[in-house]
């Protein structure tokens, strides 16, 4: 009986940690496209038209934004842990200091987006389009960038420790001061246009 009580307490506690979005915040956002520092965790925003949205400092942990249009959106300092952003359009979006740990950004469009000092540990960016993106000082440790396009990307002082850069295109990218320790560079196009095979 005691064990059952402990188990129930555990489930209740963990259930509260996976709490859903605030319904009032979601309504406000849908009505105004503005929701700074609000709670939209676990919200279903699949294919949403959110162009130019202001979500500065919002909680979007585990939110489903697959295919969403977030062009030019303000996502500074947002929490996007394990958020689903497959095929999302984030062209020109601002994600400075955003926490994208474990986020799913497969084949997302991030042309000229600003991710300066963003946290992308274990993020999945397979096949993502990152031309001209600002990743200065960003943390990309253990991130999956297999097949990602990073032409003209600014990765100055970025941390790519143990990142997967297989088949990635870094042609004309800025890697000044970047940490590539342990990164997998197999069939990877480097800034000078040469193809490198390291860790294959």
Each predicted region: which residue ranges?
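Sec-dependent N-terminal signal peptides
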Residues: 4-13
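Sec/Tat signal peptide C-region and signal peptidase I cleavage site
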Residues: 16-20
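Tandem repeat scaffolds
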Residues: 21-200
């Amino acid at each position: 009986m005691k064990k059952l009580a402990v188990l129930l307490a555990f489930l209740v506690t963990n259930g509260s940690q996976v709490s859903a979005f605030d319904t009032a915040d979601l309504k406000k956002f849908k009505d105004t496209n503005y929701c700074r520092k609000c709670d939209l965790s676990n919200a279903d925003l699949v294919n949403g038209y959110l162009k130019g949205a202001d979500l500065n400092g919002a909680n979007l942990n585990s939110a489903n934004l697959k295919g969403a249009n977030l062009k030019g959106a303000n996502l500074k300092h947002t929490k996007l842990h394990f958020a689903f952003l497959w095929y999302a359009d984030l062209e020109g979006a601002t994600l400075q200091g955003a926490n994208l740990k474990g986020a799913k950004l497969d084949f997302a469009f991030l042309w000229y987006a600003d991710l300066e000092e963003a946290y992308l540990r274990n993020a999945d960016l397979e096949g993502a389009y990152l031309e001209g993106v600002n990743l200065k000082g960003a943390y990309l440790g253990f991130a999956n960038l297999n097949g990602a396009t990073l032409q003209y990307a600014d990765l100055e002082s970025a941390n790519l420790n143990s990142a997967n850069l297989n088949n990635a295109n870094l042609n004309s990218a800025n890697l000044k001061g970047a940490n590539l320790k342990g990164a997998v560079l197999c069939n990877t196009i480097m800034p000078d246009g040469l193809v490198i095979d390291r860790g294959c």
